[in-house]
């Protein structure tokens, strides 16, 4: 038991920094997953369960199960307090499709028409029409790279992963269609975990959200023919934060000329849902 505990700690330390573990060259994982390595003492039953789990193939795990794990692991009396409820992918898609996927696809379709118009004028690769078409595509990729999705109560990260998947699907389609229009295919994608931001009050859920995004990103890349990234394998996900999304109220002073007497807003009080916060002068 003690030898296994020490062996696992040594493995996790190596995964954090990269290097040799016995005869094996372990990649540099980073990402904060092994920032603090504390392996608990393992009993015989723990070791048996660990061995059984290690014999399974986890490469195609459905990351949405982490939501169920999180909800079932909570004290039932605290679920409503935390607003913790597993939302199935079909329900999440009802938000993602009209808010993220469809608007981006519509923008891409308009841009693709412009690229096709320039393509018809291309005499040779590298001429001014080709360069103009390529620049349109690069500008589009920059837009996707800088696109951000925020879930201020992200739970175990199902929404974040499905939002990232939608972004990556749009980019993959863009690359495929751009290649059919004669543009050189880019070597890698610009979308990734940096596109999704999350806030979660529960520390366990916030960590699950990071794992969900990490695993989902790796699975998507492999399924679409891309190698997983190296140095590091995992991007740091500090933008999935463990804190309360409701920030503390900062007292404000109302300017008597900017608020009507019946607006309901008072200095030092939280404004209502339709009332502006008045900054201190």
Task: Annotate the PLM regions.
Residues 143-150, 156-281:
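Class I S-adenosyl-L-methionine-dependent methyltransferase module
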């Amino acid at each position: 038991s003690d030898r296994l505990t020490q062996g696992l700690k040594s493995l996790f330390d190596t995964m954090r920094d990269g290097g040799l573990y016995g005869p094996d060259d372990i990649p540099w994982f980073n990402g904060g997953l092994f920032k603090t390595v504390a392996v608990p003492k393992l009993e015989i039953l723990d070791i048996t369960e660990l061995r059984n789990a290690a014999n399974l193939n986890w490469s195609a795990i459905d990351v949405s199960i982490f939501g169920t794990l999180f909800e079932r692991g909570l004290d039932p009396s605290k679920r409503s307090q935390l607003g913790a409820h597993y939302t199935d992918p079909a329900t999440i898609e009802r938000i993602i499709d009209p808010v993220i996927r469809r608007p981006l696809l519509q923008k891409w379709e308009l841009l693709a028409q412009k690229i096709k118009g320039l393509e018809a004028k291309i005499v040779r690769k590298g001429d001014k029409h080709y360069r103009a078409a390529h620049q349109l595509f690069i500008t589009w990729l920059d837009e996707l790279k800088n696109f951000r999705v925020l879930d201020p109560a992200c739970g175990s990260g199902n929404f974040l992963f499905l939002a990232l998947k939608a972004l990556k699907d749009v980019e993959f389609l863009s690359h495929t269609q751009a290649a059919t229009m004669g543009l050189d295919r880019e070597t890698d994608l610009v979308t990734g975990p940096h596109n999704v931001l999350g806030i979660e009050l529960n520390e366990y859920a916030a960590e699950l959200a990071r794992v969900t995004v990490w695993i989902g990103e790796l699975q998507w890349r492999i399924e679409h023919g891309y190698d997983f990234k190296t140095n590091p394998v995992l991007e740091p996900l500090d933008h999935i934060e463990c804190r309360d999304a409701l920030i503390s109220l900062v007292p404000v002073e109302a300017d008597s000329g900017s608020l009507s007497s019946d607006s309901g807003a008072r200095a030092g009080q939280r404004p209502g849902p339709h009332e502006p916060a008045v900054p201190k002068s």
